[in-house]
């Protein structure tokens, strides 16, 4: 691509020196779950609701709706303030912190949790964004919450910290087990400024190394935010 400027506007044009195959040398994978009335939320969290405010069918000059849902709905990022007092929020992380070298790891469907032993065997590098694709991905087709989902064990989280990762993600609503009232996995990761991405849609995700881009809504001082997440090969 060739970049040109017209006033303050940047324009991108195809570079005639590059072939079509070169321009299409990479593929983008959307790892974001759609948000709708069927979106599963953690028990007690606000459910998604949409209400028409203006409608062309009702004689208005435009369509407009009001959306209501929690900030941890669907695919979302947890910031340290989610579980820690006086901790960092969305305002404290630049967008470039939320992108970089990634590793999507397939966890065998027979595994009920992500264990320290399993993590220790993975080719994880310092500053990696690590996503775990588990049997949870099959739950994305269900519209009811289940307590029996694959979670990350505390010693596995500690192993991830030892390896120096910067972001950890999983394909269900929480990295902690359902009955973990103390949320020790959240606290272990977030107290070390390892951000968490939950609710990933990994059914068609590429397994292995890729570039990952996490783009939360630009709302300041939040403990968590819905995000669009993509992988590039």
Across the structure, where does each feature detected by a protein language model lie?
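Active-/binding-site microenvironments in catalytic and ligand-binding cores
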Residues: 2-233
